[in-house]
Amino acid sequence: MLNPLAQELNETLKGSVVEALMSDMGKRMYFPNGIISQGGEAAKDAYFANGTIGMAVAEKTPIELDSYKKIMPDLNPRETVAYEKTAGNPELRKIWKDKLLEKNPSLKDKQISLPILVPGLTAALSYVADLFVDENKPLLAADPCWDNYELIACARRGAEFHQFKCFDEKGLNLADLEKTMKEEAEKYGSVRVILNFPQNPSGYSPTKDEVQKITKIVKDIAESGKQVLVLSDDAYFGLNYEDDIEPQSLFAYMADLHENVLAIKADGPTKEDFAWGFRTGFLTFASKGLNQAQIDALQVKFMSAIRSSVSCSSTPSQAIIKHAFMNPDHDTQKAELRKMLHRRYDLVRKFVNTHTSSVLTPLPFNSGYFMAFDVKKIDAEDLRKRVLAEKGIGVIQINPKTLRVAFSSIDEEKIEEVFASIYNIAEAMISE
């Protein structure tokens, strides 16, 4: 039996692409008229005393221990120990939306939601899966891809996890993307696809021409009457090292593509602003067919996923990021770090362009934190272990044929030796 509040949200979403794509769990989700909502009312109208929220308060200010204050002297108690709102700090959400529009000018006249703040990008992907993925609604992603996609889809949601071949001998394999998406649409009546650029593990971002082709693939499926959820995992957005890369997110092109397309953008300062451990991410969504009431209803669905899991995200992290964004030196400092990553990329590019291997073939890469090798003749896990044991170099085995190297975490003066060691050990292994 559905809660009446869930029924009300579902009624608002009736006839929309959201309703067609929602999982069973998504249909059950609602935001209770409980502590949070009643506390919100009291925050506005309880002028004498507020006995709603479980915090220790003195003179209308959360009590903060001196041991905390000494560590964060520039933040006030509401920015350190108080609970933050379920969907995140309103000011920070507005700032992130402004930044999103600045980085994606094609969104200027398109209706998109106010970004919802979540505890990191993994949480963002997990909440999307909660609302839209289940045992009858599989998730589609690239092969190779980040292993957390399969963990979220299969282990958490009990769903099937399907993949398309990300690359062929020519580069980005758009033919297999189209083929697989159309097969999914025909079999299940709808498609849920994660498109992650810059891609993890390969470090590849599509060109302007490739983005137009991806957009056409999605639009063709939508025009056939099938619903498509396009989840843009933009964790490494903007870290581009070649001139022909499309500078905007796929989300900018999907946001009002068709009434049958629901576009969701998962992003945040984690990688873009070098704030990995702050665990602050954002979810933004859009669809040509959604009215404001339906946008509000889907936002409430996401808030219910947050409320029923972590309740709210870390207050200090949000406060620190908000103040950093307001610091005029922030973008300058970020640009310097991006230049450092670019230099590391250039060194890796120079090495792989001037060295050959009968075992290792670099997958296409032009952006992000990583590059990866297609491994032939040997197992990538065996190579990983040998490189670690013999040279003290850590890399990641994604699958038996894919080895990932995060050049983002390797000092410039060590890059040539690291890659030479990987190549040399790989060649030695096939001659043993």
Each language-model region and where it sits:
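Conserved glycine-rich beta-strand-loop-beta hairpin in the small C-terminal domain of fold type I
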Residues: K334-R349, L360-D374, P400-T402
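Short beta-strand
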Residues: F48-N50, K85, L360-N366, V395-I398
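Well-ordered, non-membrane alpha-helical segments in soluble/globular domains
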Residues: R28-S37, L65-K69, L177-E178, K208-D220, ...
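PLP-dependent enzyme catalytic core of the Aspartate aminotransferase-like
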Residues: D98, E102, K182, E259, ...
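Conserved core segment of the aminotransferase class I/II
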Residues: P4-L9, L13-G15, A255-K339
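Short, solvent-exposed loop/turn segments at secondary-structure junctions
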Residues: G54-A58, T122, W146-D147, P198-P201, ...
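N-terminal small-domain helix-loop-helix segment of the aminotransferase-like
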Residues: L2-Q7, G15, E19, S23-G120, ...
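Conserved core of the PLP fold type I
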Residues: E79-V230, F237-H258, E413
